[in-house]
Amino acid sequence: MSLSLWQQCLARLQDELPATEFSMWIRPLQAELSDNTLALYAPNRFVLDWVRDKYLNNINGLLNDFCGTDAPLLRFEVGSKPITQVISQTVTASVSSAPAAPAARTAAPSRPSWDNAAAQPELSYRSNVNPKHTFDNFVEGKSNQLARAAARQVADNPGGAYNPLFLYGGTGLGKTHLLHAVGNGIMARKANAKVVYMHSERFVQDMVKALQNNAIEEFKRYYRSVDALLIDDIQFFANKERSQEEFFHTFNALLEGNQQIILTSDRYPKEINGVEDRLKSRFGWGLTVAIEPPELETRVAILMKKADENDIRLPGEVAFFIAKRLRSNVRELEGALNRVIANANFTGRAITIDFVREALRDLLALQEKLVTIDNIQKTVAEYYKIKVADLLSKRRSRSVARPRQMAMALAKELTNHSLPEIGDAFGGRDHTTVLHACRKIEQLREESHDIKEDFSNLIRTLSS
């Protein structure tokens, strides 16, 4: 039985699983083969339980494929494999998320190597982490499940799980909440951890002040000696060449010290214009996860949780009514609920659907005006560079059929029209055709990064 057995399994799993799943759950595993037993070591209990629940059959199936009746037994452990039994996990260059680290990268230094600790005073760190944003009050749904799971692992194992962690998605979807949740999680495990949260513009402002005050070395020392650096809206580095230069070196210093970096953006790293390619490449060294607009069930759960936090009884049918009509992001949902609560407090009236219609009259009218089937068809046609007439035609080529399915799925998601009504609007198609289109797009969003990106981009455009 070859020691490359786990490497063979990794290669097959990489082919069979979506890239994000492989990076998040399979790549962190370490393997040890001994006495006809393959031990897989997970970095924490959360990963172990998830892998055993979701991928046990896949792994056992591969072991049987490769070894037949001689397949080893499978055992799961939390921790690291014994140092004496080193089994390389590198499958291909594409599996590795970053170039090989220097041999000296073994432990996070308390200060950068160039810092003269005896000559420099102890730095004072401003955390800026909001204690109100935790994992406990983050509402999990299909749209953000992977992002939350990755953030949770980083909080449990900073510098070791996914570094850097890059979260991207539209405005108001929970990226900032997760940044703060990670910061709070790290500090809960280690009270004296040096965790710094900031908007990217603050980094730029600090650098400018340091240059003006001839204090650039102190600036470098400050940012390169944190345990975790959490930067929001990294896209604001665009076209700021001096800031990008300094962040490039800060990024490298932190990574070499096993210090955690988490970044957020409103778009995929490679799509950030005005940012150097060498930075965009580094953004993807660890794990990149999208946060999509919340689906209906998650929107309802967010409203119910927010109401509960405010000691407000929100009937389920009212939460469903609001969630069905406001779809773009969490911030919009919470803002609408705050308005409903304020109106109820001022008037003393019960929160009913009729009351919500009145309290959110202008917001609901604007939403219905913005998102119509006609508007969806025009937006999708423009996005895919085809004609609206193509969407309504009988043509079945993929270049037309896929955009048509996308438009139907968006119509179901963003409007209150029934399936037959949507079918009529697409050239008199049957409601079963619309249902098939919706299911197909949902399936492709799980399997294809491009379709997932297209759906998110179109939702963002139509909801803005």
Curated annotation (Swiss-Prot):
PANTHER family, sorted: CHROMOSOMAL REPLICATION INITIATOR PROTEIN DNAA
Region (Domain IV, binds dsDNA): 345-464
Region feature (Domain I, interacts with DnaA modulators): 1-82
Region Disordered: start-end pairs: 98-117
Pfam families (UniProt xref): Bac_DnaA, Bac_DnaA_C, DnaA_N
Name of the protein described by the UniProt record: Chromosomal replication initiator protein DnaA
Source species of the chain: Serratia marcescens
Domain of life where this protein originates: Bacteria
Subunit structure: Oligomerizes as a right-handed, spiral filament on DNA at oriC.
